[in-house]
Amino acid sequence: MSSRSSWSSTEQINRTISSRADDLPPQPRRLEVVSKQATRVTALSTKLEWKIEQFEKLMKLIKNGSNLISRMFSVPDAPTVCWELHVYPNGKRDEDVNNVSFFLRQVGLARGEEPIMTEFQIYALDANNQRVSVCRDTKDFTNQQGRGKFQVSRDKMLGALRSDGTLFLICEVEYFPPGSKISVEPVVDEDVSTEEQEEMPEVIVRANNRSMWEDELFTDCVIHVGNKHIKAHRCILGQNSPVFKSMFSSPNMIEAQKGEIHIEDAKYDSVRAMVEFMYTGATESLESQGNIDEILAIADKYEVLMLKDQCERLIAQTINLKNVTQIAMFSDTYTADYLKSAVIRFLTTHHRVVIKTQDWISLKKSRHELANELLEAVLSTDQDDDDVTSNIPISVSPPPARKRLRRSAK
């Protein structure tokens, strides 16, 4: 009886609650507005792969304090930030003997710019393609500053060598470019495909500009170089070159009246490369053209500064003991500041050898002010830098030969 009574009471309570709920007025529907947002953060990353042959012998035979320097590596999206890896096979200082010292060096920013907080790791791949860690760290970098020192024992490095005695080094660097901003943006509609999202608008614009130029669509001016010509658009030339803009803006100049430009002090290929850059922001196979110095000269004349900057960086990668003096004069002739800074960095390590060469002796006689400027800069860097290289450096794989640079433009 008690069980049936309990069930009846519960049923009655449920009915009462249901009845009261039915008696309540309908509740207003809640209007919910969702703002979908995303914080987009794009870090840049670059990677160096560097093979150093006969590294076991280098650890035994190289004097303490002598170093190897990699070629500069960077990201095209941030050309003002470049990196070098420095390796001392027998340690940097006296107390580092029997160790290998490693430094990562940032060589692109101008003096006074904000430091770049950077995450990086350096490791080797041994004979079994297994990683042998050198370091993993996060540090802030300013211009010309090497960060480290990271010490690895000689025994550990011996175990990191490939079967042929080669050291296969890898350096991975990740950072935010100078001036980067973190922004909050609306979320892209999920119905839009990933492929469409990744289709960068600027890529489409560049492709359209190239087609317009190559198809000579609505061109309104022509550039004469020798017996060849290049058709173009005044608006594109004027937008990218203050010199062309001045020509087309002056009604008394023949360029403005007839839309014809005659260039007699440059080669056709160099002028065409400059015009191509104005339309697309790039020049196909710039590194393989073999006339980077001529392209820089014409870019300097017509003040196409972004192209000039790219040429400076490419030439900087070719500096060696044989051409450093010529490149120094070239950089001074065309006020190529980045290239001159690269010369100074090279001299900081190599000055003891360079100042004994016949080219340097000739430079002191013909352009002594430039020679003094370079040496003063080397001394200044030597005092300010916390990673100063010293003694005679070793070049494991010398840069490829390139043609002699012109000393001046005609």
Curated annotation (Swiss-Prot):
Pathway: Protein modification; protein ubiquitination. One of its GO terms (cellular component) is cytoplasm. Pfam families: BTB, MATH_2. Residues 45-173 form the MATH domain. One of its GO terms (molecular function) is ubiquitin protein ligase binding. Signal peptide: none annotated. Disulfide bonds: none annotated. Residues 219-287 form the BTB domain. It comes from the Eukaryota. One of its GO terms (biological process) is regulation of proteolysis. Residues 401-410 have a biased composition (Basic residues). InterPro entries: BTB/POZ_dom, MATH/TRAF_dom, SKP1/BTB/POZ_sf, TRAF-like. Residues 1-19 have a biased composition (Polar residues). Residues 1-29, 389-410 are annotated as: Disordered. Keywords: Ubl conjugation pathway. Probable substrate-specific adapter of an E3 ubiquitin-protein ligase complex which mediates the ubiquitination and subsequent proteasomal degradation of target proteins. Interacts with cul-3. This is BTB and MATH domain-containing protein 42. The lineage of its organism: Eukaryota, Metazoa, Ecdysozoa, Nematoda, Chromadorea. The gene is bath-42.
